[in-house]
A protein has these predicted regions:
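Long, compositionally biased tandem-repeat segments
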Residues: 1-297
Length: 297
């Protein structure tokens, strides 16, 4: 409806087809419609974009990407209007990236969180998470989505969204998938791309944990590197560095994986703390050494 009704949801995609976009909200408290989910197929369909909000409505969530041979990305969240938040990004299908979070409204809207990446297949790596940016003067950036896990090591998490130009805090980086690296936190709000006076930096993403070794033979995977914290403003704190991922355990014969190093703290009026290192994986029950623990910067 033109005054209060929410936008309609997008339709479900046909086999291997993309989901439809959610309808836009028009006025008052209208929220945007949710994007349709992608159809299941050999390369799963993309999720539809969430509808944009009306006057006070929240942006619609992006549709989820379908699971398929390669997967597809989740739809982007819709944009908030005046003081409303952006919609969340859709989940990635297997092997697909998460959708980006929608941008916050013009005055105070927070950015939507990025959707998580889908799990990787036997050979695929997981997708990256998306990120949303804060709108207006003090909208906070959305958090980056987590990276998907995978047999060959997960991909990194999404970067945190940037805070709005005056007071917004940066969003936190998403955690890495198994064996992957987390992405860095977003910048605190700043005018023309510079850190604002009161915007804190987003925390860095944690590194993903290493996968265990094979049942009989095989070394554990190494933990992912934690990412650096985002930059804070002169009157604010830099983001904390992400934790290093733990090394994977060997099972019977093999060495444990090394732990990932922690990320550096972000700069700012007060620097953020560095992230702790991950623990080393255990060696095999019959033969094998314990992995080396990661260090904090």
């Amino acid at each position: 409806g033109w005054l209060y009704g929410n936008g309609g949801a997008g339709g479900q995609g046909a086999t291997a087809g993309a989901g439809g976009a959610g309808a836009n909200g028009v006025s008052s408290t209208n929220g945007g419609g949710t994007g349709g989910n992608g159809g299941i197929g050999g390369t799963g369909g993309a999720g539809g974009a969430g509808g944009n909000a009306g006057l006070l409505g929240v942006g619609g969530a992006g549709g989820h990407g379908a699971s398929g041979g390669a997967g597809d990305r989740g739809g982007a969240g819709g944009t908030g209007f005046i003081s409303s938040d952006g919609g969340a990004g859709g989940d990635g299908g297997d092997g697909g990236n998460g959708g980006a979070g929608g941008t916050g409204g013009l005055l105070f809207g927070a950015g939507g969180n990025g959707g998580p990446g889908g799990s990787g297949g036997a050979a695929d790596i997981g997708g990256n998470g998306g990120a949303g940016n804060g709108g207006g003067t003090d909208g906070n950036g959305g958090n980056g989505g987590s990276g998907g896990g995978a047999g060959s090591g997960g991909d990194g998490g999404g970067a945190g969204g940037n805070g709005a130009w005056l007071f917004g805090n940066g969003g936190a980086g998403g955690g890495g998938g198994k064996g992957g690296n987390g992405a860095g936190g977003g910048l605190g709000g700043g005018s023309f791309g510079l850190p604002g006076l009161n915007g804190s930096g987003g925390d860095g993403g944690d590194g993903g944990n290493g996968a265990p070794g094979g049942v009989l033979y095989g070394n554990g995977g190494a933990g992912g590197q934690g990412s650096s914290g985002g930059i804070g403003g002169p009157g604010a704190t830099g983001g904390a560095g992400g934790k290093g991922g733990d090394g994977g355990d060997a099972q019977l014969i093999g060495d444990g994986g090394n732990g990932g190093n922690g990320g550096a703290g972000g700069t700012g009026g007060t620097p953020g703390p560095g992230g702790p290192g991950g623990s080393g994986g255990l060696g095999g029950l019959l033969f094998g050494q314990t992995g080396t623990a990661g260090v904090s910067p």
